[in-house]
């Protein structure tokens, strides 16, 4: 039996989640764009579960900001899903990424736009309008969104051969989407005065990288059963560590390696936070502290959300906090006795 609390995020990083009212508004949006049907209760619930994490990411945002952030996350989920699960062939996937990049960079819809492209165009234009004259924050959002969409297909290619943990960690820093998520927070706070030189500081980037890795470690542990069932275990660090140790019988040892790595990065985060703040003026410290705190909310909030959502829940999950026998919507159950992680035949 494994314990999720072995990921030892400081208690003071925990905050009460925001209201979930934005979810119904966002779902009505995507129904209006023809992305899901009004009577498709199952798909509506899946979207609900996916974007509910925004309440943990932005605990102090107002309703307008939550709808804006929730809409961008929803677009992210709808864009990522067919690419992330290899539902499309490579050529079609690359075409979608290229079309989306052009849409974002030129702020122009392509010929014969899809409903998802229309939705993406609309919500990103809302983000730009919200920024007012502080368009530099919008520029950062676009830059990091393009960076993220180009990481999806390479990340999936890790399934094609055994991957070294360091290779996975390098790609995962981008693919996990935390820098992209942080850029949504830049939009939310675009009316606050911020010295962009501070956000360009390499010590701040180090904090973003450490946050990205920590969230990816938590996600890999939480999604263990889901990844085994869906065949995505070749790019899951938790499972890779198990395979390198010799198989499923080494699950406890692999989990300790993963949590030790995470906790070491938490210590590094605290160290580099102090180092960064000590190098700044008092005004710069005040400007950047809100963004550093947000990274903490992302890390701790993601851990808490993982125990609340049915996205990863299953009655036989090896992590006790993620066991849920009432999850009937998303089928993640696997037979642990039939799991083999010594080769490609996982089940």
UniProtKB/Swiss-Prot annotation:
Source species, domain of life: Eukaryota
Xref: Gene3D superfamilies: Farnesyl Diphosphate Synthase
Induction: Expression is almost undetectable in vegetatively growing cells and increases during development induced by starvation. Expression starts to decrease during culmination (from 18 to 24 hours after induction).
The protein's Enzyme Commission number: 4.2.3.-, 4.2.3.200, 4.2.3.46, 4.2.3.47
Keywords: Lyase, Metal-binding
GO biological process: terpene biosynthetic process
Family listed: Belongs to the terpene synthase family.
Protein name: Beta-pinacene synthase
Gene name tied to this protein: TPS5
